[in-house]
Amino acid sequence: MYTLELGDDGHFKPVTGEQFKTVPAQGLPTMEFYRQQIVLGLRDYARRCGFKQIVVGSSGGIDSALTLALAVDALGADNVVGVTMPSNYSSAGSVDDSVDLCRNLGIKLYEHPIKELVTTYARQFEASFGEPLKGLALENLQARARGTTLMEFSNAFGHLLLTTGNKSEVSVGYCTLYGDTNGGLGLLGDLYKTEVFELSRHINAHAGRELIPQVIIDKPPSAELAPGQRDDDSLPPYPVLDEILKWHVEGKHLSSKEYAHAAEFVEQLRKQAGGPETIARVQKLVFRSEYKRRQAPPMLRVRPRAFGTGRQMPIAAHYE
């Protein structure tokens, strides 16, 4: 364990990466350490904040699936509910996957389509402002319709709403303010997307059965806010993105082995066609997304350097 020390100014000294790395010092596998940390963190947070029940928007994707599985681990199936909110761009498979997931977890799943809500809002917007909603604005409207629905559920029934964004998305701003960022706590905000996949597989292995359907783990990540949309249409592939982020966001706060791997990966990427541009683009996205992170709910920390007090950057700055 690490020890908090007072500095000469009377404030606690920052906890360094080296200090934090001593926490899982009993030979615990990394994914099991993450599982236990998140489960304990949620259980403690909910108790101290007076919440007994949890609600999560279930998209049929891996982030919401893992969040639901961890919530059930922390508070029990009777205290967790999912809400699936299909739109015009939601695949039938996503709804079916949500049904299968919640059946495996033993939790109740509500279905609340947002098609009519989005259509009505878009029509009224055009009538008032003379321009139709299209492109990113229409995509974000769907995310905000879901976020508003979930917050209303939270208000009406007293459930704690969990956000489902992971560290990869949070780093580069691949999220919608007042949409999928709505909630009271984020469980995955310090896990990279590649770790989300790894922890999901570990959850199934730990349970000895398929809690998270394999089809959810295998499917290409997608926000499903536009026809045929995939995450890698907008971002580098997650194995590439995550190594850049480890090098840029956490750097030497990482273990020496993990930092050496990330640094070598980035160095090799620089030598490839388009590599320098990819690295620069990711760095710019991280800087420009600070304003989103400042408005996001608190996120449980499991890695050497988390956003928030672990990485303080100005919101308004010239990043070109």
Language-model features and meaning:
Residues 1:
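CN hydrolase (nitrilase-like) catalytic-core segments centered on the catalytic cysteine
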Residues 6-59, 64-320:
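ATP/NTP-dependent adenylation/nucleotidyl-transfer catalytic domains that generate, transfer
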